């Protein structure tokens, strides 16, 4: 670590690689709620946050684990389909909480078009949440529905069979779960 009279120690969360304060400041200055999308090794997490002086306040939250518990989703909780459905769910929950618009906060993730973060963003936009974005970054509809998994018969998709779902049936199952979410939240 550098020393000397001119050395300034970075904030702890910056040193730990958890927060980009320049990006966070830009998001906070906008004074809009943030759509925070994070992906872990097993699920996708989406939250609507507002910044307060005492700390961020969560207005709505959704996880891909919630899809399995509430809507009977049998697919993987970390794939593109689950990210889209989680985004759709957070969009509807945000509207119930009175949030009509938000800005995307993807944290320290690399900005890559077609990623799961953008699949969640597409779900939120499809639910009616206003988020400024370009259509070019969204994954294709075939990828969101899981057509790429259904067309692949590789043995790496055995987790689906353990959950009682054949990989070839994922697009139909996706449409079924999307219909359940839309009927529960979208018809209001």
From Swiss-Prot:
Gene3D superfamilies: 3.30.420.100. GO terms for cellular component: cytosolic large ribosomal subunit. One of its GO terms (molecular function) is 5S rRNA binding. InterPro entries: Rbsml_uL18_euk. GO terms for biological process: ribosomal large subunit assembly; translation. Keywords: Ribonucleoprotein, Ribosomal protein, RNA-binding, rRNA-binding. HAMAP family: Ribosomal_uL18_A. This is one of the proteins that bind and probably mediate the attachment of the 5S RNA into the large ribosomal subunit, where it forms part of the central protuberance. Belongs to the universal ribosomal protein uL18 family. Part of the 50S ribosomal subunit. Contacts the 5S and 23S rRNAs. This is Large ribosomal subunit protein uL18.
């Amino acid at each position: 670590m550098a020393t000397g009279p001119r050395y300034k120690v970075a904030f702890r969360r910056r040193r730990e690689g958890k927060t980009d304060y320049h990006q966070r400041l830009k998001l906070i200055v906008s004074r809009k709620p943030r759509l925070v999308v994070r992906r872990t090794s097993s699920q996708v997490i989406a939250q609507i946050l507002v910044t307060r002086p005492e700390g961020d306040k969560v207005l709505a939250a959704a996880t891909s684990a919630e899809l399995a518990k509430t809507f009977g989703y049998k697919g993987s909780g970390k794939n593109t389909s689950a990210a889209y459905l989680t985004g759709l769910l957070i969009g509807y929950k945000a509207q119930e909480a009175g949030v009509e618009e938000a800005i995307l906060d993807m944290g320290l993730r690399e900005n890559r078009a077609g990623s799961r973060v953008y699949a969640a963003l597409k779900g939120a936009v499809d639910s009616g949440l206003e988020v400024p974005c370009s259509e070019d970054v969204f994954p294709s509809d075939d990828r969101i529905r899981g057509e790429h998994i259904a067309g692949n018969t590789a043995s790496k998709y055995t987790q689906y069979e353990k959950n009682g779902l054949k990989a070839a049936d994922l697009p139909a199952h996706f449409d079924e779960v999307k219909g359940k979410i839309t009927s529960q939240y979208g018809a209001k």
